[in-house]
Regions:
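N-terminal, active-site-proximal structural segment of metallo-dependent hydrolase catalytic domains
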Residues: 1-38, 48-58, 246, 250, ...
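Loop/turn elements at helix/coil->beta-strand transitions in domains of secreted/extracellular proteins
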Residues: 15-19, 42-45, 105-110, 142-147, ...
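Catalytic metal-binding/acid-base residues of hydrolase active sites
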Residues: 25-26, 115-117, 153-156
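Extracytoplasmic/secreted cell-surface and envelope-processing proteins
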Residues: 29-32, 56-58, 120-123, 156-160, ...
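A long, amphipathic alpha-helix that forms part
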Residues: 122-144
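Metal-dependent phosphoester-hydrolase catalytic domains
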Residues: 139-147, 155-267
Length: 267
């Protein structure tokens, strides 16, 4: 937990992001321990998490300084049946976790935290997840000035041209397509010797016309958070958390986080 907190507090002058999207959280008690014992400097409000249908018992969650605007909700993703007996897939996947917040000035932001079906699922399952995400975003955009989706999309470099560029980009601004042009990725596949942007932040293009609200994605702010030495191997690749042979902790996560800021423009 201390290492996770170190990475979070390394941003925004030691305060961490105003809104943090988290994946693979065990339960609300663990997240509250992280907030209260290790993230006091961030002054986050009580953690936000709803237990979902994941078979492994992991969920998406939020830490934020923004006030809630309504009750959080889970939106299930229905996956089509896999008829190939050689494919071992999960029967359920993580739901889309929605929480709505008040921005400075009173505008409403809808945040959709996601953790899409893993790579061993067929690509159709990630397509279905993208379709469901669009439905949820369209509904959220009826009341919110801006809708964000962020988390682990599990879209690797082989699927990215179809899923990110051809499908998602029609409805969303995607961090690594809008900015971060020199960024390599958030996850490294050692077997393929290739980076992937499994993780991203997306801003919905639909809903209330952008001309009618002042909050926009700032492409120049987009970057991969990987400057902390504890996050990386000597090669620069992500180093997942482990206890080494000497009993010492090493690493933080096998994914690097993504950072993005919204900018307020005059109407």
């Amino acid at each position: 937990m201390e290492r996770i907190a170190t990475v979070i507090l390394s941003q925004n002058n030691g305060k961490g992001a105003d809104l943090v999207f988290l994946c693979e959280v065990e339960n609300i008690s663990v997240l509250e321990r992280l907030r209260q014992e290790y993230l006091q400097a961030a002054a986050y409000r009580p953690a936000i998490l709803l237990e979902g249908p994941d078979e492994r018992g992991i969920d998406c969650a939020f830490l934020t300084r923004l006030p809630l605007d309504g009750s959080p909700a889970l939106h299930p993703i229905t996956l089509s049946k896999v008829n190939d007996p050689s494919k071992v897939v999960e029967r359920t996947t993580r739901a889309i976790f929605q929480a709505d917040f008040k921005l400075p000035g009173g505008e409403r932001l809808s945040a959709l935290a996601i953790h899409f079906p893993a790579g061993f699922h067929p690509i159709e399952h990630r397509k279905e997840a993208l379709s469901r995400l669009k439905e949820v975003a369209q509904d959220a955009a009826k009341k919110s000035q801006i809708v964000l989706a962020a988390g682990d999309f599990n879209i690797n470099f082989k699927e990215a041209p179809e899923l990110y560029n051809n499908i998602a980009a029609r409805d969303w601004q995607i961090t690594h397509l809008e900015g971060c042009k020199e960024c390599e990725g958030t996850y490294y596949y050692a077997k393929d010797e290739h980076w992937s942007f499994l993780d991203a932040i997306m801003v919905f293009k639909g809903g209330i016309p952008a001309a009618h609200h002042r909050w926009k994605m700032d492409p120049d702010s987009i970057r991969i958070v990987n400057e902390n030495v504890i996050q990386k191997k000597k090669t620069g690749f992500p180093l997942k958390f482990m206890i080494d042979k000497d009993g010492e902790p090493r690493g933080v996560s096998d994914h690097f986080p993504v950072w993005m800021q919204l900018k307020a423009e005059a109407l």
